[in-house]
Amino acid sequence: MFSTSDGILTVEGVKVTEIVRETGTPVYVTSRALLERNLEAYKKAFSNEGLLYAVKANNNLALMRIIASHGFGADVFSDGELYLASLAGFRKDMVLFNGNSKSRKEIEMGVTAGVKFSVDSLDELRTISKIAKEVGKEVEIAFRVNPDVDPKTHPKIATGLRESKFGIPHEMVREAYEMALKLDGVVPVGIHCHIGSQILDLSPFVHALNKVMDIAVDIEKLGVELSFVDMGGGLGIDYEGKGAPTPKDLASAILPEFEGRKADLTSDPQLWLEPGRSIVGNTTVLITRVNAVKKGYKNFVAVDAGFNVLIRPAMYGSYHRVAVANKMDAEPEEVYTVVGPICESGDVLARDRKLPKVEVGDLIAVFDAGAYGFVMSSQYNGRPRCAEVLVSGDRWDVIREKESYGDLIEKQRLPEWLL
């Protein structure tokens, strides 16, 4: 869905130069066609299973409306994400409230909304039970299991190891289900696990699934009737151009194992997954403008997007492909390091990349920026957040406006005694 025309990067049928003339830079530009292709790939690979979009990856309402229209549920991690998921129109019977530190306010909101909960601790279980009794509801729950499985990814996004803050240790989950069965207001109907993000080796998924299914067999003996086994998300994407497993590959790895292990159960649970990055990651390009080219010990290209706009390279050392969006047909000439305008030396988007000759005013495209891009952006250094655009064929529209200087102080208040 990304191509070139007259040496200019195009998103579907639109040149990015046309977009930035109106929006300015930086700007996130998303392809609707690519988003829908990713959604259909999951639906085809897991046609009889439950698919919940991980709202954390990208919470833009327009994009979530498209995702919800394809029949997806939602994995939410906060009251704000639950609010956005409700506006987007996700199936209520497939909204799972995740998270390791839910406040009473968040739990009350989820119980009132009638969503399912992934319970992360016994304290949380007691709070859900208490609130459910207060409002006269029964809440369907799963426990999040920590399986102690290495997902072979960046340590900051590995969530299923024993030292992770998430989930109940797999050796202690039986006790949690025993407690849930004795409490009013909660009904255990599932089991949940999420081992990490940007996973490119499928074997940890299979390892985790087998640990979870061992637990499922055990808790059924307590009288728990499982309606779903949620293995979370985490499928990685091809940031570096070296290849990545597809939803079809993931299905081939885990569905036969899941179906085989279900023979050990008396119930017939559905497999649930929570894709996020692999739905939206490759759909979006960040367009940023060159403010300066500085030569010295290194050739630096200074652009108007830094880790205030895309924090992944600074936070995780992540690799994103870059190109000169207005010189797509030009031959690479020099090695550059692309840096942002933020007052820290870690503000680097791309290191040592061979690009065509870069000049002031050129546009740098940062690819695969659809997941954990805008949602992790900030107003650091007093920089208003950028716009987001959706392209559909030869049409495009702004789906999030660029912030103004006024937005920097919108929620601030000056006490009268300072005036």
From Swiss-Prot:
Binding site for pyridoxal 5'-phosphate: 234, 274-277, 372
GO molecular function (one): pyridoxal phosphate binding
Residues annotated to bind substrate: 277, 312, 316, 344, 372
Enzyme class name: lyase
Cofactor: pyridoxal 5'-phosphate
Listed EC numbers: 4.1.1.20
Catalytic activity: meso-2,6-diaminopimelate + H(+) = L-lysine + CO2
Pfam family, one: Orn_Arg_deC_N
An individual GO BP term: lysine biosynthetic process via diaminopimelate
Pathway: Amino-acid biosynthesis; L-lysine biosynthesis via DAP pathway; L-lysine from DL-2,6-diaminopimelate: step 1/1
Modified residues (N6-(pyridoxal phosphate)lysine): 56
Active site as annotated: 343 (proton donor)
Keywords: Amino-acid biosynthesis, Decarboxylase, Lyase, Lysine biosynthesis, Pyridoxal phosphate
Database matches in Gene3D superfamilies: Alanine racemase, Lyase, Ornithine Decarboxylase, Chain A, domain 1
Role of this protein: Specifically catalyzes the decarboxylation of meso-diaminopimelate (meso-DAP) to L-lysine.
Family recorded in the similarity comment: Belongs to the Orn/Lys/Arg decarboxylase class-II family. LysA subfamily.
Subunit structure, interactors included: Homodimer.
Protein name per the record: Diaminopimelate decarboxylase
Species this chain originates from: Archaeoglobus fulgidus (strain ATCC 49558 / DSM 4304 / JCM 9628 / NBRC 100126 / VC-16)
